[in-house]
């Protein structure tokens, strides 16, 4: 290929690029958008449902645990506690899984299973697992013991928590 042919090819490429650029400028002049966006993307307006508002209100309102325990249902608690079995065992002297076994947990000193390594957040709590502490922990473990390694989000309905506590208290006597 001679130098003249190479020059013709380069000139054709430059000319085509120039034409494409000119067409773009003309199109921008003719079809200039008049709308200037404040932000990118698409926003969806969502109204909070009354269910969400009630949940927030119930989380803030004090809960009468003794009254809830009077109406608690251990059979319902057994069903709700099935999600606990992913990480915990309910058997007497059962194996520790991701969490310690829950046999006889109601009334037991906190962080007291010798062969389980508790998080420092739970180890420093002290005391026993009574109705109040079980209720607070099952409602939102991360709030009751900040830094706990228990990743469970918690049980939102107070009556469900009372049912689980009653199940944990009566389970010891069923076996």
Swiss-Prot record:
Heme c binds at residues 84, 87-88, 150. GO terms for molecular function: electron transfer activity; heme binding; metal ion binding. Binds 1 heme c group covalently per subunit. SUPFAM superfamilies: Cytochrome c (SSF46626). May be involved in electron transfer from bc1 complex to aa3. Pfam families: Cytochrom_C (PF00034). Belongs to the cytochrome c family. Keywords: Cell membrane, Electron transport, Heme, Iron, Membrane, Metal-binding, Signal-anchor, Transmembrane, Transmembrane helix, Transport. Its main location: membrane. InterPro entries: Cyt_c-like_dom, Cyt_c-like_dom_sf, Cyt_c_1A/1B. Residues 30-175 are periplasmic. It is found in: Cell membrane. PANTHER family: CYTOCHROME C (PTHR11961). This is Cytochrome c homolog. One of its GO terms (cellular component) is plasma membrane. Residues 1-8 are cytoplasmic. The chain crosses the membrane at residues 9-29. It is a single-pass type II membrane protein.
């Amino acid at each position: 290929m001679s130098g003249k042919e190479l020059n013709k090819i380069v000139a054709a490429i430059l000319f085509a690029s120039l034409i494409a650029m000119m067409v773009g400028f003309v199109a921008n002049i003719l079809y200039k958008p008049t709308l200037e966006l404040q932000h990118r993307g698409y926003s969806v307006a969502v109204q909070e449902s009354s269910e969400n508002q009630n949940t927030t209100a119930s989380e803030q309102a004090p809960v009468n645990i003794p009254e809830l325990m009077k109406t608690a249902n251990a059979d319902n608690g057994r069903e709700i506690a099935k999600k606990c079995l992913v990480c915990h065992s309910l058997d007497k002297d059962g194996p520790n899984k991701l969490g310690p076994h829950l046999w006889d947990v109601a009334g037991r000193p906190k962080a007291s299973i010798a062969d389980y390594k508790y998080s420092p957040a739970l180890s420093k709590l002290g005391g026993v697992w009574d109705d109040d502490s079980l209720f607070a922990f099952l409602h939102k473990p991360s709030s009751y013991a900040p830094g706990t390694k228990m990743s469970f989000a918690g049980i939102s309905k107070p009556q469900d928590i009372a049912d689980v506590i009653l199940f944990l208290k009566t389970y010891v006597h069923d076996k």
